[in-house]
Design a protein with these regions (language model features):
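Contiguous, well-folded functional domains in the mature portion of proteins
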Residues: 1-135
Length: 135
């Protein structure tokens, strides 16, 4: 499901695929292989209500047959299913401009400690910075 709200009547881009391997995606493996650079990836660019331009990137992983995205260009809304991973799970990376988002402190601290954090769909990860909400 799409984790952020896109601007009304602003279409997301088509899906872009980047060929790559299917290494396991976990903190230990990332010490040996740069999975976010080497694994198969698919991404979409969009304009969001509170964060400005953003990218959602799905990262393929070991035991993931492929990435399936339903929509090409078009209007999306928060909570809509954008696609899924066939067989198994993987990782989704959200990219924002640094001045637009404030990540929750508990996630930053766990990251500094090298800990993986399991998250649930819909769980808050951060919020738009105040100046971002006003622009």
């Amino acid at each position: 499901a799409l984790p952020i709200s896109v601007k009304t009547n602003e279409p997301k881009s088509r899906n872009y695929f980047i060929k790559g391997a299917y290494h396991t995606v976990n903190p230990t493996a990332n010490n040996y292989v740069s999975v976010y650079k080497e694994n198969a990836r698919e991404f979409t660019m969009m304009k969001t209500e509170h964060f400005g331009d953003a990218v959602q990137m799905e990262v393929g992983a070991l035991m993931v047959g492929r990435i399936v995205n339903h929509h090409e260009e078009g209007i999306m809304h928060r909570g809509m299913e954008k696609g899924y991973f066939e067989f198994g799970g993987s990782t989704i990376v959200l990219l924002f401009r640094g001045d637009k988002v404030e990540i929750d402190e508990c996630l930053l601290e766990r990251t500094k400690d090298g800990c993986e954090t399991k998250l649930k769909q819909g769980q808050r990860l951060g919020m738009a910075k105040k100046q971002s909400l006003q622009s």
